[in-house]
C-alpha cells in the first residue's frame, strides 16, 4: 500500500492539471505557431514556465492503482495494479475476464 501522502500528492496534481489545461494549451499553441514573431513566442514560453505551477503539467501525473495506490505495474484499461487485478480476476470480480488456456 502506498503512503497516503503520495496518493494525495498525485490527486492534487490531477486537479492542477485540469485547472490549468486551457491556459497551457493556449500558450503551447502560441509557442508552436511559426507565423508569429520570435518575441511573441518567447514571451509565451516564459509565461508557460514562470506563471504556471510546475505540477500542472500532465507529465507529472503518475498512474496509480485505484485500490492500493501502487505506482508500478498498473493496467490502464482497469486502473488496477497487476497484483490486485490477478486477485479480482481469480475470484471472478471483473466481468468478461477469463483465465486463458491454449
From Swiss-Prot:
GO terms for molecular function: rRNA binding; structural constituent of ribosome. InterPro entries: Ribosomal_uS14, Ribosomal_uS14_bac/plastid, Ribosomal_uS14_CS. GO terms for cellular component: cytoplasm; small ribosomal subunit. PROSITE patterns: RIBOSOMAL_S14 (PS00527). It comes from the Bacteria. The keyword Protein biosynthesis does not apply. Transmembrane segments: none annotated. One of its GO terms (biological process) is translation. Keywords: Ribonucleoprotein, Ribosomal protein, RNA-binding, rRNA-binding. Belongs to the universal ribosomal protein uS14 family. Binds 16S rRNA, required for the assembly of 30S particles and may also be responsible for determining the conformation of the 16S rRNA at the A site. Part of the 30S ribosomal subunit. Contacts proteins S3 and S10. This is Small ribosomal subunit protein uS14.
